[in-house]
C-alpha cells in the first residue's frame, strides 16, 4: 500500500492506470476483489501500485507459480548462464539468485559456480529443491535490508541474478539498497525486468495484476544503484518479449556514465479502456467456433477474465500443464482449470493462448497430443 513515495517521501502523484476493483488474478479460486491502481510519484517519477494486498497473501500458500513447469524456461536457463559467463569467470564466483522459486536455474548453475545461494519467500517452491546439491543453499524468506543482515549476505557475492523479480517487491527502494550491499566489488548483477513503458506502448495491459507492485524502469534502476555501471545491454533479447536484459557491475569509479535513455511512464487510462473494448471484440469474433477453451491459467488469463464479461461467457475451461492448478478455478469466476493430459482435445476446435511468448512450446505440445484445431494468441 502506497500513501507516499518510500523513496523521496513525496505525497503528490499522477494517475497512470486504474483497473478498478478486480480479483487477485495471480492466485486461483479467490472471490474477493481489490483495487488495482498505479500512480507515479511527481518528484522521483517512479510508478507504484497505490493499494495492494500484502505480500503474505500474494506469495503465501496459495501462490502457484513453479518455474520448472515451463519447458521453454528450462531451456532458456542455459542462455542465462552463457550470458553470465561472457561477463565474469563463473567457476570462481559465489552466486545469489533472488526469487529462485523451485531452483530451476540454481540446479543448472550449481555445477558451474563456486557456490550458489537462492532466496525466495514461496515455501512450496523452495521446499521442492534438493538441498543435497553440493555448494548450494536455499533461504526461504523475502530479500530486503533486514534479510541481508540476518543471513550474513553483505558483500558475499560475485554474481547476483534478479530475473523478473524487481517489479514484484513490496519496497523497491529498500530492495535496491540491499542489492547494492550484497555484491562484492567488481561483482555483477544480471537483470531481466519487464519494461512497463514498452508494455503500455504496445497495449499489453494483461501484464498487470496484483503482485506487480511497481513499474520501475531500467534507467531508474541505473540511477538508483549509484556505484554500479552498465557493462552489457542486451535489449529485449530475453525470455519474455517485454523484458529488458542487462548487466550492471559494481565499481569504485566516480565518473558514472548512463547507458539508458532518461524516459518515464505516462498516463494510459484511455488506452486501457480501448483495450477492454478490444478484448470484448476479440471474443465476440469467436462465435463461429463450436468449443473454445483457454490455455494457461496464469495472471494474464485472470486479468482478461476480470475485465471482460464477454470472455467469461465464451470460455468455461482453461487448460494448463501445472498439476497444482488442476480442478481449481480462475479467481473471480466459475471458469475451471483442467490438466491438458486429462482433457479430450478432439472436442475442441479453438484454443486461445494467453501467453504469447510460449506459443512455439504450446503449439508443439498440442500437435504432439493430436490437436488439429485452431491455436490463437490473445494479442490486440
Identify the residue ranges that each predicted region occupies.
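N-terminal juxtadomain amphipathic helix
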Residues: 1-72, 236
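Hydrophobic, well-ordered beta-alpha structural blocks that scaffold small-molecule cofactor pockets
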Residues: 84, 245-380
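Conserved class I S-adenosyl-L-methionine
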Residues: 92-101, 292-295
